[in-house]
Amino acid sequence: MLEHIEKELLEHQKTFEKVWEELRFHIYTASIICIEALKNQKKIMLCGNGGSAADAQHIAAELVGRFKKERRSLPAIALSVDTSALTAIGNDYGFELVFARQVEGLAQKGDVLIGISTSGESENVLRAMEEAKKRGCKTIGLLGKDGGRIKDLCDAAIVVPSSQTPRIQEMHIMIGHILCSLIDESF
């Protein structure tokens, strides 16, 4: 069992080192997009499935509540939390539109949509990103593997260089925390 633990920790460390080497500028770019939107009284929307939905909720909570320091509440919403909207849209329009329909109803020009997908191929996240672009929103992808089709829809694509979902998810929440910390420093 100790060998398994060591293997997991070493894989995490290797992925972290790649993120450190390759993604600092992309994280910086994403933070600037978020900070500018929030300073212009715009909101941040986030979406994802499964663990990525949990990350979306976590990041939104850090912005609406607080992260490390006292500051005003910042407008952020995870599109995965409204079960009535999710089930109504899923039933009437299909699961691939559960986020896009919410973006259609909630997004205003200048808002930010952060789409989280370990594969970069989640159809409902992709459709939400397309809708956000149509509405004049900035788009940020927290992605994995090669970034998939979602990468091409992003103003800032943060693609974790790994094909292992657990490693990608670990980096996504760390990157989310870094974004929250950078946002904190601006308010």
From Swiss-Prot:
Binding-site residues for substrate, renumbered to this chain: 49-51, 62, 91-92, 117-119, 122, 169
- Residues noted as binding Zn(2+) in the record, renumbered to the chain: 58, 62, 169, 177
Keywords assigned: Carbohydrate metabolism, Cytoplasm, Isomerase, Metal-binding, Zinc
- Membrane-crossing segments per the record: none
Which GO terms label this protein's molecular function in UniProt? carbohydrate derivative binding; D-sedoheptulose 7-phosphate isomerase activity; zinc ion binding
Q: Tell me the ranges covered by the SIS domain, including all copies.
A: 34-187
Output the Pfam families linked to this UniProt entry.
SIS_2
Does the entry feature the keyword Secreted, yes or no? no
Protein location: Cytoplasm
Q: Name one GO biological process term.
A: D-glycero-D-manno-heptose 7-phosphate biosynthetic process
Cellular component aspect of the GO annotation = cytoplasm
Reported cofactor(s): Zn(2+)
Task: Give the cofactor binding note.
Answer: Binds 1 zinc ion per subunit.
Q: Which reaction does it catalyse?
A: 2 D-sedoheptulose 7-phosphate = D-glycero-alpha-D-manno-heptose 7-phosphate + D-glycero-beta-D-manno-heptose 7-phosphate
Q: EC class of this enzyme?
A: isomerase
Matching entries from SUPFAM superfamilies are given as: SIS domain
Q: Which EC number(s) are documented for this chain?
A: 5.3.1.28
Q: Which InterPro entries match?
A: GmhA/DiaA, Phosphoheptose_Isoase, SIS_dom, SIS_dom_sf, SIS_GmhA/DiaA_subfam
Q: What else is known?
A: The reaction produces a racemic mixture of D-glycero-alpha-D-manno-heptose 7-phosphate and D-glycero-beta-D-manno-heptose 7-phosphate.
Q: Which HAMAP family match?
A: GmhA
Binding partners and assembly: Homotetramer.
Q: Which family does the record claim for this protein?
A: Belongs to the SIS family. GmhA subfamily.
What's this protein's function?
Catalyzes the isomerization of sedoheptulose 7-phosphate in D-glycero-D-manno-heptose 7-phosphate.
Q: What is this protein called?
A: Phosphoheptose isomerase
